[in-house]
Amino acid sequence: MGWAGVLLAAGCASPGGQPGEASGQAWSGRLSLRVDSEPVQTFSALFELRGVPQAGELILTSPIGNTLAQLHWAPGEALLKNGSQTRRFDSVDALIEAATGAVIPVGALFGWLAGREERVPGWRPDLSQVGAGRLQATRESPQPRADLRIVFERA
């Protein structure tokens, strides 16, 4: 299911979960993802990312504050909550791929947001603007190409 499917399935979900469920680092801001598939998929949302690569949560909300999806992960499990539905996956990578059509390297994302050069095959992060709260990363392979742009601040 692509982001459009997540959005349609999510509708106007209300927030759930407990604040601070995942300890570690925290960021918030806006993200956009473009996957050059056929047809092209685009998605943008406000986000809150908390935790560490091994266990954390990502909450996506619309500009007017409706929760679009909540992603929670821990070793061996990843959950996608949207509305009253919960879908389970074996890993956060499988969860992200099912939701977006592209594997976004969550482990590396934590490093990139912290300004660390984390190497991921096929991905090219641009960390030149991280100090100003901007990150861009492009996935060249495998196809389709994906472009991730994030404007963020530490939460």
Task: For the regions a language model picked out, list residue spans one by one.
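N-terminal export leaders
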Residues: M1-W3
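Bacterial Sec signal peptide processing site at the extreme N-terminus
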Residues: G11-W27
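Mature, soluble, non-transmembrane domains
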Residues: A13-S14, R87-A155
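Post-signal-peptide N-terminal segment of Sec-exported extracytoplasmic proteins
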Residues: W27-L68
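Short polybasic amphipathic segments
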Residues: L31, G76-K81, G133-T138
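Short, surface-exposed charged micro-motifs
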Residues: L46-E48, L68-Q70, E77, R124-L127, ...
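An acidic-aromatic
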Residues: A55-P105
